[in-house]
Amino acid sequence: ISVSVGKGMTEIFKELGVDYLIEGGQTMNPSTEDMLNAIAKVNAKTIYIFPNNKNIVLAANQARDLTEDKEIVVVPTKTIPQGITAMISYVPEKNSAENIEAMLQAIEHVKTGQITYAVRDTRIDDKEIHEGDMMGIGDHGILAVGKDRMEVAKETVAQMVDDESEVISIYYGADTEEAEAEELATALEEAYPDCDVEL
């Protein structure tokens, strides 16, 4: 069971073998009841739940605690990329203890950055932000602020990439043109030749 946002991400999770998807998002966090309904619909003795948002982990844990007839394993994924990485690490032949260990190790190495618009003037992490500015938000705060989406995206990635980075995955929403995403991918390939860039 995975929480997902949007059609594109839902397709990715389906391709990775997720049996049941719950629509989520910043303003619509699934409840414990939503989780229990999903658990009831999945015909399996062991069910893995990927919350993919730190605000949903509690609901998933409560659903696990309220379920007695199935083994529920909550993988504490806090972002969609962590959820995707955890699913890729899943091996059906392994038991739940082996799988959770592999998944936890895998998500430990995932860094997530998001590019979004500022909805109001504010000051966060010593950065002056104005309504309409582009912001690059990482796992631990604001990484970049600016007027140009492409430049903010590049700076956000620059703040996250280190010597251990191997793969840079770009997921883009409906309001981003494919050509713009391809331009970013090309720029990142040139800037980080030791990393695989996926679009």
Q: Predicted regions: what is each one?
A:
Residues 1-199:
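N-terminal loops that bind phosphate or other acidic moieties
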